[in-house]
Amino acid sequence: MGRDIYPNMQRLLAFARQSGMKIVYTLHTHREDGSDMGMFAEVWSPIANGACLVDGLPGIDVVPELTPQENELVIKKHRYSGFFGTDLDMILRSANINTVAVTGVTTENCCHSTARDAMFNGYRVAFLSDATGTFDYPDAGFGAIPASEVHRVTLGILAVSTAHVMDTEEFLRLSSTSRAGQCSAA
């Protein structure tokens, strides 16, 4: 899931670092005792049985290819959105950020929720179509859904409701001509 987006994310990180953009990583984690899982435990069994997204266990860390540098923020979140229950909005506002670029996984959950909340909070949103990814959905009573379809539909919804959906090349081109430091990669 998502490894094919690493090269684009690496290009984006290199550009953001060189341009002085604020880079913020968000990690979806839950407490070991499960006290913050809420409905996640009801709808997704890997969370319910503590097999994934548990703070301190392998699998929640940023992959080595995209490791944050010392000066880059890493925010742990307990819901899909990087804004919900975190200080992300305050951090961005204090840095006079007005645009958020969204990358990562999963397109339809964490990335989509973060993009929506960014827009709801008054930010311009760039959603990077080739730097976001997802996985195949099993049949939950509605038929299995391939990752490509989940991704395509989510991008279509975002494009007409929430964000400027673009690929890495377009983002780099547009960002090269705008003022550096006004955008945050999340």
Specify the residue positions occupied by each region the protein language model found:
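Short, flexible, mixed-charge acidic loops at enzyme active sites
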Residues: 36-43
